[in-house]
Amino acid sequence: MLPFPNKKYGIIYADPPWQYKENWGNGQVGYETMKVKDICKLPVSDISMDQSHLYLWVTNPFLAEGLEVCKSWGFNYKTLITWIKTYKNGQPEMGMGYYFRGCTEHVIFGVKGKMKCKNKITRNMFYAINSRKHSQKPNCVREMITKSSGDIPRIELFAREEIQGWDCWGNDTKKFNKPYIQDSFQWNTC
C-alpha cells in the first residue's frame, strides 16, 4: 500500500475501488479493486481532523458496505448526495443493475466531530451528463464539496486525476489528467 500523507485534513473525498462479486460487460474495470475489509482498514481516521467531513462514493449495491466504511473511518453518517446520470438529451442513463437498471451513484456524507456545513442551500442531488470515462466523477462534485465544507485542507483518496487545491492519494493519480473543463450539470432540476 502507498504510504498515507503525514498531514491532517478537514475534507476526505474518496471513491474506493469496490470489488464486485461479478464482472459486467467486458468484465474488466481497468484498475485494481479492494475488498471492503481492506478499505475499512485504511488509516483514514489518522489523517482526518477532529472536526471533518467525509464524502464517500458508493454504487447502489455497495450502500451498506459504504456505511460500514464510513463508520470504520471514524465518521458518523448524516445523509446521501445522489448523482442522477443523464444522457446529453437530459434523459436518465440506462445503466447496469442486479435487479433494476441503475442511473444513480451516491456520495455518503459523514461527519467527524460536530463540523457543520458552510452552505445550507446545497441540495442533496444533482443531474450531470455521464459522458466521462468509467469511474470518472463530475468535477462539479468537488466544487459542491468546497462550497459546503469550506476552503480547508482536503484530500481525494483513490484519486485518478490531480486537481489544484486538492492533495491526492492513490496508485493512479494521473489517469484522467487534462485541462480542467467545466461539466455540463444542473442542480436539482426536477
Predicted regions and their residues:
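Class I S-adenosyl-L-methionine-dependent methyltransferase catalytic core
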Residues: M1-C190
